[in-house]
Amino acid sequence: MNITLTKRQQEFLLLNGWLQLQCGHAERACILLDALLTLNPEHLAGRRCRLVALLNNNQGERAEKEAQWLISHDPLQAGNWLCLSRAQQLNGDLDKARHAYQHYLELKDHNESP
C-alpha cells in the first residue's frame, strides 16, 4: 500500500510538529516529523524542524545525520553547520564540533557582509 499526503496534510504535520517543539515536547515533535519525512523525505522544512527537535531531545547521533543530510543539500546555510556543531558536542566529538562551528562563523560572516 502506497500512502501519500496532500500538501495541506504535510503542512499540518509540520506545523503540529513545530507547535509541539515550541511547547517543550521535543519527543512528540519528532514523532510527527518522522511521519511527515517517512512519506516525503525531501521536505526541507520538515527536516530542519526535526533537526531542532532532535537536538532539544539530546539525540546527538540522529541529529548529526540529519544535519549532514541538510548540509549535503544546502551547504551554504549557516544554521545547518551550527546544528551540526551542537550535535557533535552532544556526541562528545569536540574537535569536529569546533570545525563545524568555525565553518558556521565563516558562512555567517560571509552572508552578513555587504
From Swiss-Prot:
Cystine pairings recorded for this chain: none
Keywords: Chaperone, Cytoplasm, Plasmid
Annotated compartments: Cytoplasm
Keyword Cytoplasm: yes
Induction: Temperature seems to play the major role in regulation of transcription of the lcrE-containing operon of pYV, whereas Ca(2+) concentration has only a moderate effect at 37 degrees Celsius, and no effect at room temperature.
InterPro entries from the UniProt entry: T3SS_YscY (IPR016684), TPR-like_helical_dom_sf (IPR011990)
Statement: the UniProt record of this protein carries the keyword Chaperone: yes
GO annotation, cellular component aspect: cytoplasm
Function statement: Required for Yop secretion. Functions probably as a chaperone which stabilizes YscX within the cell, before its secretion.
Known partners and oligomeric status: Binds to YscX.
Name of the molecule in the record: Chaperone protein YscY
The species this protein was found in: Yersinia enterocolitica
